[in-house]
Amino acid sequence: IPYEKIGIDVAAARIESYDDKSRKPTEVIYTDLKGDLFRRDFTINAMAVDILPESFGELHDPFSGILDLQAKQITTPLDPDETFGEDPLRMLRAAYFASQFGFEIDKKGYDSIVRQKDRILIVSQERITAELFKILASPKPSIGLVILQETGLMKLIFPEIDIMYGIDQTPEWHHKDIFFHTMQVVDNAAKLTEKMEIRFAALVHDIAKPITRRVDQKKGYTFHGHDAIGEKMLDKVAQRMKLSNNLGTYLKKMTLLHLRPIALAKKGVTDSAVRRLMVAASDETDDLMTLCRADITTKNSKKVKKYMQNFERVDELMKNVQERD
């Protein structure tokens, strides 16, 4: 129902029953308000406000959702095994709420996600991808992404990210663990931009590092070709995750090019090198530079300052080249 500038959804109070192999209800029973709130995902969403004139504004909170809201806790009205069993997507939604609001999943719910994780496979890929987008759009995406990894959900919905966990990098340049380096890059990107596409690119930019890691006796670990191999890997990822063609192409380009500005920043910048980069990146040049800034995760403040200054030089040269061309 349209009301002023918003739309109001109207639905009858109901209880739904499910079987073990589908998230579609096998039976719908119409019920009262408490019965309807009983089937909600979390107690913080199981509250209602009366709009009848004689009791307008009265809060109905049968499961102490207000207390959980104040405690910043994600709790289910029912036993979490039942709640997550009915609609397994709620497990991803719990991770999203944790990322979006900085809340914590209560222990019973967390343990239930670990037990129920395999049921996520009955959910359509489109719904899973949409929930992942929400996590990436949150203020600190790493919170939800780490929950997915620790509970075992990441292995099921995004195995290419899961295998990053526990794989060391050369400490001089990055955090030792590729997974946690990636989490830092995603969070850095979230601070720099609200654009979900850049945040997604931050998540996948090192996707090929686990399969390209080699040992160099002088340099430690190397990941030669992880940019080009990562670009190829993203074809299958985009297809599996039902990404749009535009997003898939964008992620491939950002992954392929993400080392180019970093290389320029390390070695110094020439007009011809900048021009080649601009041609390759095309309309995504600014996005690529944002990703590269996010990719600076070293704790060495002198190196951070140096790279940032060099990126500023790259930006300035791009403007100069663009004006002359």
What is each model feature region?
Residues 1-325:
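Catalytic cores of the polymerase beta-like nucleotidyltransferase superfamily
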